[in-house]
């Protein structure tokens, strides 16, 4: 037979503990084309003067995997995309106005500008609460020079973020400039106009970190805890934001990169039958306006993070473990009976008898199973 004992509040204890795990991503994960998955959701077509049709297809974001994404064992690491604020100089300088419904209009020389604006709006809506709000670093700054017009978004996957990123553990290495395109930039070049859109660079790297975030706690009502990302060599230089619970990094492209650097190479263009057209202009605004989302992301992924086996991004995640401990206390002489058939003889008399020091014989038993029941005596758990 079972013996029941009612539990009191003193027998139940709830605890919360944190488990931290070190995460790091290597350069070749983000730079390799086989580890970046593109889902083509945008396509456009136009006729040139000769009536030939050319089109550009592109994704809105790219997902980076830890190995070839076609393998079943591959894991999603993060999403990478680009967005631009709707009232920024990048947009207003190339927009031809709006239609009667308020939709932004752009000339054919630009590509996917509405999609780039929509990405920024979506991120602002989810992290700041409204798509009219603009990201700024330091967080909440109202100074124009701290506003983020052109943003590179890194959306880390929940598999690695878990319940959030631990403050002051985030660090990322990035190259501020692409390979040189002109002899004026690099005297080693034999000719001007070398293509550098998708050519890696090996110098000029910086470490972007959230050092100091623990002493300056910022919070968004919609995005959770926020940290300011700075240059590790000059912590007064703000480069972006990190939303710890969301696992989203927002980088100010105009500060992490040289926006005036000349870009040379080929990008997709509307009405071009070869799907490419040469470009040789500044990174901002020319390249980010003229290139598709895939071309912009391909440039950053293939040239700005390196291509080796070294770590380019690392952080510690935080897993919250909620535990409820139920103490089943058995005091002296409690539960001294067993339903095991060997506990009694054929006549029903208890055979498990032990004589104590006073010569008093008492029965004894060993607890083998403990059941946890609710108020209706329904079994909930067994130990």
Question: Residue spans of the language-model regions?
Answer:
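Long, position-biased, composition-driven segments near the start of the mature protein
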Residues: 1-383
